[in-house]
């Protein structure tokens, strides 16, 4: 499920990426090419800092986020997952 965060940001998913229908992606997320996001994974970038700013969660090309993984960025925290990474 791809959904907006309270600020209105929608994930950007490369056309070659695969997101399992049971996975949840919410907010300011950038998913690179040939990324695999497995069943029941949850990736949330939905908290802003006191100035309303939010850094994205970025998943580099050719990475895979396996079944049931949860990634959540807190306000003011940047999450960058490099290329060819498996979590």
Which residues fall in each region the model found?
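A detector for short, charged/polar N-terminal pre-domain segments
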Residues: 3-10
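Right-handed parallel beta-helix/beta-solenoid
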Residues: 26, 46-53, 74-76
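Intrinsically disordered, low-complexity sequence elements enriched in Ser/Thr/Gly/Pro
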Residues: 1-2, 42
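A structural motif detector for beta-strand N-caps
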Residues: 11, 16-19, 23, 29, ...
């Amino acid at each position: 499920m791809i959904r907006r965060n309270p600020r209105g940001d929608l994930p950007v998913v490369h056309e070659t990426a695969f997101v399992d229908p049971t996975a949840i992606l919410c907010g300011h997320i950038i998913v690179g090419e040939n990324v695999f996001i497995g069943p029941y994974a949850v990736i949330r970038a939905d908290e802003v800092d006191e100035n309303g700013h939010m850094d994205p969660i970025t998943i580099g090309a050719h990475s895979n986020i396996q079944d049931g993984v949860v990634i959540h960025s807190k306000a003011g925290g940047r999450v960058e997952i490099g290329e060819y990474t498996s979590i």
